[in-house]
Swiss-Prot record:
It comes from Kineococcus radiotolerans (strain ATCC BAA-149 / DSM 14245 / SRS30216). This is Dihydroorotate dehydrogenase (quinone). Coiled coil: none annotated. GO terms for biological process: 'de novo' pyrimidine nucleobase biosynthetic process; 'de novo' UMP biosynthetic process. Its cofactor is FMN. Disulfide bonds: none annotated. It catalyses: (S)-dihydroorotate + a quinone = orotate + a quinol. It is a peripheral membrane protein.
Length: 366
């Protein structure tokens, strides 16, 4: 059934969705997933079709039990409107957002472009979201009626565009205060290329007060320790990656999410005219694989197991997942592969990962 659904999706994607504006196509597809999950028996049917995680894939990270190490990266569900639905399609964790303290429309459209030859997406969405207060209300309602199949909920927070850099720490803290009570973990996003000046906050002297303000606000509002991670860009120099890693250890963060999208366009297969037409913004997907893995290796060597590392960027196959886990990641996330491969993708790669682990255990000398 999963293989069939994958073929059907790719046919629909090729003949219909690629003819539609990518943002509209995303809205249609996401609405369809939510609608399917609202049918009374659908969650059970979908879970049987798309999930059934192998017990060998279970992992405990951040004090949380994850049925598998694969989560959906931030950006797909910006406003917490489809967490349970997405869990039905095989993700053990859904990271919502990016959410800002103030609601904002994001950047002008069109702001999402496909580079199909590269299996990549270019976005300059600009943190379009309903704002922390609205998203917190949705999360509170979700927590009040637990789903049949619980999903780990990560919340990714960013700076409101209208807020000056000098006030960034308090802006992040406002989001943390509202959202932390309903989050399994929080991610401070200082690495999107689509909010002017945001990446400047990755500098240690600017990042430190943001992290401290978020931690104090989150733990105070939730009356518990809320695991806190920071998400970094792949475009940081190796020295800057080291500096952020050192800061994360020094400030006793729980982990690092690496990496966000890239502003680089090197090595793309798509025609130059198509790349130029896509314009600026962050590129995700297969071209990010090499740099994302490089950053992971560097972080693992620098932090020596003292932080949880969540690897994101260019993950498409079970082999990619295994490679990231072997390189030091505790969890992995994906987004672009889900867009290109469709609803059966997560279960397929997780099944292949479980089979690979089984073979490794069988081949291990006794």
């Amino acid at each position: 059934m999963v293989a069939g659904s994958g073929r059907t999706y790719r046919t629909v994607y090729r003949h219909l969705l690629t003819r539609v504006d990518p943002e509209v196509a995303h809205r249609w597809a996401f609405a369809g997933m939510r609608a399917a999950s609202r049918v009374p028996v659908a969650p059970h049917v979908l879970r049987r079709a798309f999930v059934e995680p192998d017990p060998r894939l279970r992992t405990r990270v951040l004090g949380i039990d994850f049925p598998t190490p694969l989560g959906l990266a931030a950006g797909f569900d910006k406003n917490a409107t489809g967490i349970s639905a997405l869990g039905n399609f095989g993700f053990s964790c859904v990271e919502i957002g990016t959410v800002t303290a103030r609601p904002q429309p994001g950047n002008p459209k069109p702001r999402l472009h496909r580079l199909v030859a590269d299996r990549a997406v270019v976005n300059r969405m600009g943190f379009n979201n309903a704002g922390a207060e609205v998203v917190a209300r949705r999360l509170r309602q979700l927590r009040a009626v637990p789903p049949v199949h619980p999903v780990v909920i990560g919340v990714n927070i960013g700076k409101s565009k209208v807020v000056a850099e000098a006030d960034a720490a308090q802006d992040y803290a406002t989001s943390a205060r509202l959202l932390a009570p309903y989050a399994d973990y929080l991610v401070v996003n200082v690495s999107s290329p689509n909010t002017p000046g945001l990446r400047d906050l990755q500098a240690v002297e600017k990042l430190r007060p943001v992290l401290r303000a978020v931690r104090e606000a989150a733990d105070g509002a939730a009356h518990r320790h809320v695991p806190l991670l920071v998400k970094i860009a792949p475009d940081l120099s190796d020295e800057d990656v080291d500096a952020v890693a050192d800061l994360a250890v020094e400030e006793e963060l729980d982990g690092i999410v690496a990496t966000n999208t890239t502003i680089s366009r090197e090595g793309l297969r798509s025609p130059a005219a198509l790349v130029a037409a896509a314009g600026g913004g962050g590129l995700s997907g297969a071209p990010l694989k090499e740099r994302s893995l490089e950053v992971l290796h560097r972080l693992a060597a620098r932090t020596r197991g003292s932080l949880v590392l969540v690897s994101v960027g260019g993950i498409e196959t079970a082999q990619d997942i295994a490679e990231r886990l072997d390189a030091g990641a505790s969890l992995v996330q994906a987004y672009t592969a889900f867009i290109y491969e469709g609803p059966g993708w997560a279960r397929r790669v997780l099944g292949e990962l479980a089979a690979s682990r089984s073979r490794r255990e069988t081949d291990r000398p006794s």
